[in-house]
Design a protein with these regions (language model features):
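N-terminal Rossmann-like FAD-binding beta1-loop-alpha1 element of flavoenzymes
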Residues: 2-28
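Glycine-rich FAD pyrophosphate-binding loop
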Residues: 21-41
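Active-site substrate-recognition segment that forms the wall
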Residues: 43-51, 55-95, 180, 220, ...
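Rossmann-like flavin
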Residues: 86-209
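Predominantly flavin-linked oxidoreductase catalytic cores and closely associated redox partners
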Residues: 151, 155-184, 191-280
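C-terminal catalytic lobe of FAD-dependent flavoproteins
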Residues: 164, 305-306, 330-332, 346-434
Length: 434
């Protein structure tokens, strides 16, 4: 079968790799000059099953109100005269109940753990080098109330098989001595031994190279303009995708199946077909610093809960990323938010890096209100979805690619996840006190 994959980030490239492994003819289309040039370019570097608690949780509404108007707030909702933003916001609030949060955690843990194991197998199979470290992820807290409120979600994750173990402040510093300078401010933490870190850009580029060598055709500098369809109801299908190629010519490409893996831009592509995805861009920031004093820089990947920042050591670089700005599709850098990242990183590790020459970056995370992605079938028989991975694209990417390849090939993915367009039954779970 001939399959066209739209998008070459970690999700699209993984989809292409597994589709090719299953014997399909695969074409990947992306508007950038190479793979992983947008949201997969410079994220926080964490493969973090332990980050399964979504932004939408019972404590979120009050926090969002408290942070309104603060330019350096971890989650900044900047109201716009835009119906989709407000509709997304209302759906976000609906996901903040304990019951919805618990079910979303279950879904996210399932696909994330499946993806972590898939990534490990891919690493062993391909030998791709991407500055990966399998040293776990350490969350630390500087607010007792926030630490206490994290315990129910951590317990639920443990019950679901994610070993997110709560530890005291002394154990936090024992595991990561680079935090010794703020020991008096740390109230506790949790450590997930099976989590990892690595450079998603390096990995995706490496996988794209190997996929191309295996016969996947990549068409870069090529813009997708629309999808053509025919028929209605059960007989509806996509007949082709209109593109503008690298020479500026309009063309229509045909295939048997199409995979939409265009992140935040998936929503606008599919809307003319009557497919409404609840995806809105969440602008995330990262800063990359050259490490000048390796002994002072952290080795374990960290999550600073109070500032909603993640820290990953990528070879001789330190990547610090986080925050979320709900403010449309603009990718311009906000100076206040950039400076807040450097200020906090310097507080944590004052002698570790060259803080005078940071490399700042923004990317648009494709956020669903629940943080659960769309993976699976659409109402159009030969159109498939692999999008909406939010803050966990790197964590979920490899497994999402493997799962969509199975679905297109008529197979049942080996993971208990609510794939779109497929029957799914799961036991009801409730978020309980720790």
């Amino acid at each position: 079968m001939k399959v066209i994959v739209l998008g070459s980030g970690i999700v699209g490239t993984s989809s292409a790799w597994f589709l090719k492994k299953q014997g399909h003819e695969v074409i990947v289309i992306d508007r950038q000059p190479g793979a992983a040039q947008e949201t997969s370019f410079a994220n926080g570097g964490q493969i973090s099953v332990s980050h399964a608690e979504p932004w939408a949780n019972p404590s979120a509404p009050l926090k969002v109100l408290k942070w309104l108007g603060k330019e350096d707030a971890p989650l900044l909702f900047r109201p716009r005269a835009e119906w989709l933003q407000w509709l997304w916001g209302m759906c976000f609030l609906r996901e903040c109940t304990p019951g919805r949060t618990a079910e979303n955690i279950r879904q996210i843990v399932a696909i994330s753990e499946y993806s972590r194991l898939t990534l490990r197998s891919l690493r062993e199979e391909t030998g791709i080098q991407y500055d990966n470290l399998s040293k776990g992820i350490l969350h630390f807290y500087t607010d007792q109330k926030e630490f206490d409120s994290s315990l129910p979600a951590a317990k639920l994750m443990r019950d679901l098989g994610c070993p997110r173990d709560s530890i005291d402040a002394d154990e936090v510093v024992r595991r990561e001595p680079a935090l010794a300078g703020i020991r008096d401010k740390i109230v506790g933490g949790d450590y997930t031994e099976t989590d990892e870190s690595g450079d998603v850009y390096q990995f995706t580029m490496g996988l794209a190279d190997k996929a191309a060598a295996a016969g996947v055709q990549f068409q870069f500098n090529t813009t997708v303009t629309r999808l053509f369809s025919e028929g209605t109801g059960a007989s509806a299908k996509i007949t082709g995708v209109e593109i503008i190629d690298a020479t500026g010519r309009h063309k229509t490409l045909h295939a048997d199946a199409f995979v939409v893996a265009m992140g935040s831009h998936s929503q606008s592509l599919l809307k003319p077909l009557g497919i409404s995805l609840m995806i809105y861009p969440g602008k995330g920031y990262s800063a990359t610093y050259q490490i000048t004093n390796p002994d002072q820089a952290p080795v374990i990947s960290l999550t600073d809960d109070g500032y909603k920042l993640v820290v990953s050591r990528l070879g001789n670089r330190l990547r610090v990323a986080g925050t979320c700005e709900i403010n449309g599709y603009g990718r311009e850098l906000n100076t206040a938010r950039c400076e807040a990242i450097t200020r906090r990183t310097r507080e944590l590790f004052p002698h570790a890096c060259d803080y005078d020459n940071p490399v700042y970056w923004t990317g648009l995370r494709p956020l669903t209100p629940s943080n659960v992605p769309y993976i699976g079938k659409s109402r159009i028989s030969n159109l498939f979805l692999n999008t909406g991975h939010g803050t966990l694209g790197w964590t979920m990417g490899a497994g999402s690619g493997r799962a969509i390849a199975d679905i297109i090939s008529g197979l049942q993915p080996d993971v208990d996840f609510a794939f779109t367009g497929m029957q799914h039954q799961a036991g009801k779970i409730v978020l309980q006190p720790a």
